[in-house]
Amino acid sequence: MRLEIPVGERAIVLETGKLARQAGGAVTARFGDTTVLSTATRSEEPRPGATFLPLSVDIEERMSSAGKIPGGFLKREGKPSEKAILTARLTDRPIRPLFPKDYYYEVQVIGTVLVADQENPYDVVSMVGASAALALSDIPFGGPIGAVRVGRHPDGGFILNPTYQQLEESDLDIVVAGTKEAITMVEAGAREVTEDVVVEALEVAQGVIREQAEAIERWAAEHGEEKQPFEEPGENPFVEELRGAYLERIKEGLISTDRRARHEAIDLLKEELVEGRSEEEVPLVLDALAQLQKEAFRKLYLEDRKRTDLRAFDEIRPTTAEAHVLPRVHGTGLFTRGETQVLSSLALADLGLVQRLDTLEPQTTKRYMHHYYFPPYSTGETGRLGPPRRREIGHGALAERALLPVIPSEEEFPYAIRIISEVLESNGSSSMASVCGSTLALMDGGVPIKAPVAGVAMGLVKEGDDYVILTDIQGLEDHMGDMDFKVAGTRDGITALQMDMKITGVSAELLKEALEQARRGRLQILDIMREEIAEPRPEISDHAPRVEVIQIPTDKIGLLIGPGGKTINALQDEYGVNISVENDGTVYVAGVEGMSVKAAVSAIKGMTKEVEAGDIYVGKVVKTTNFGAFVELTPGRDGLLHISRLAPGKQRVRRVEDVLNEGDVVKVRVLEIDKQNRISLEMVED
């Protein structure tokens, strides 16, 4: 069975019934030649003891899909790439809110990349495929969803599902997902576009999403499985019992500027409520308390028009920004907003340390990297340390995307750049604090960024047509609210967006209002950062490596490298520098000592310079013959000093060795270069 859904001038093609027929639902989704097999399967029984939806979404990249063999000794795929993890998160986020409440069956969604055509990204294809697989399966699901990427032509027109090449030229890369009624997820990177451009893109996307969702819904009604009967559990009897006596007290307990004090108040209430209860009643009482907390929270915001920390809805928390907080590190920034604190550190290196990518995408290197760390102590807890979790990878990628548009080009700043953001305290919006801390670190390190970038997380509490939009949400507002909408940008425009919904979606009009409120908050934060450091420092840190860039003729590349790398290795050893050469003749020379770098550059210029008549060299005699001596002017380039020119005046020299021997150093002038590129020399007296 086949379904073709138009997307702009092209179409996404869905097929089912041929591959993976034992999966709960299986769809092959194709756009261009990029093809993803999406499957959705559930367990036969609910997971024992589950208190949340046990949904897992994974992306399996197969290097054969791009005609490649994996690198490394094993020559097979290993752990998921960063792109696979980010695509799994992108697929997970819009579908997770659409499962029934208290649905505890294990649900596994897998997207296997079968073809990566190097032209069309596979992430949106995976999202649409996953939606269709769930719709066809017997799994209860409040979708289907649609998904589309929107780019922008240089002339301002929008492009639906742009190619990699079109994205290179686009100032907007926004992925939007949602149901036929509303938007449920947004993920975007941009080059300082205005809020109006983003809203226009959302409106364009919403129309495409509606068409996709309706088409998949009709297709599933015709070809899908009958949905698993599932009745949501009835009302917890303890909710009504506790509401009258405790709702106001819970609401009072939520009001505090101190996260720990709020937790302690709720913990005391828990102890009081479970005291004297039977073993069977305790989990029901705790569940009732959790429900009443959410109810109290919503009453506080929608009826009392108050926040738990008593800020105005558009007010940011007390904020401080500090630059240069650590010695020797190439650049540092400490950003504190309320009970969220992030320390960002900059490391600069020569371009030999750019990240090499072995992925399904055309991009093969990454020069600017941002890594985010979230240790357990940041929330006052214990926990495991180890490889980064998906959340850390996702938050790091978002902060990286927010800053990428202002990072100077390789020609302007020939360094590999790595930022690490260490979350020291967390009570909401740590990824946006990472953006702010990273901006401080970059400017402190003398990286000539185009403009400072700040970020703020927006929230929403909504019941029917009544809603409040929140600026700079803290952890409780993220947990109990309906939206987490992160917005980063400069004074001139947006550089990154990420939105996740816990309700079934919001309109583009509401998001427009949230974007404007976010813009005002972002400008306040940028003002605070500007008071600490207004622009990048004029020089990089004394402890950072020095990099100089020179251009040599392409026909001199072999001369610089030498046989088996002999010449370039000798230069690196002699001057204590790293030298890398590009195919176009660009040479990067990096070292800790500036004088050593300059000396190495001088040597490279000398050896790769075109020899011209009249040039004077100090060279070593490399060979003597009965008619003269050969003098090395530059590595691999010799000239002949004829025996007749070994002595001053017309004095005759009978044997070359009477004047010069191999290994002697002599000062010579270039007399001429003949048509066969042979060089004639004469002695120069000191």
Swiss-Prot record:
EC number(s) of the enzyme? 2.7.7.8
Which reaction(s) are listed as its catalytic activity?
RNA(n+1) + phosphate = RNA(n) + a ribonucleoside 5'-diphosphate
What are the annotated GO cellular component locations? cytosol
Residues annotated to bind Mg(2+): 478, 484
Question: Single GO molecular-function term?
Answer: magnesium ion binding
The residue ranges crossing the membrane are none
CDD domains named among the record's database cross-references: KH-I_PNPase (cd02393), RNase_PH_PNPase_1 (cd11363), RNase_PH_PNPase_2 (cd11364), S1_PNPase (cd04472)
This protein's superkingdom? Answer: Bacteria
Q: Which top class of enzyme applies to this chain?
A: transferase
Report the function annotation for this chain: Involved in mRNA degradation. Catalyzes the phosphorolysis of single-stranded polyribonucleotides processively in the 3'- to 5'-direction.
What name is this protein filed under? Polyribonucleotide nucleotidyltransferase
Q: Which gene encodes it?
A: pnp
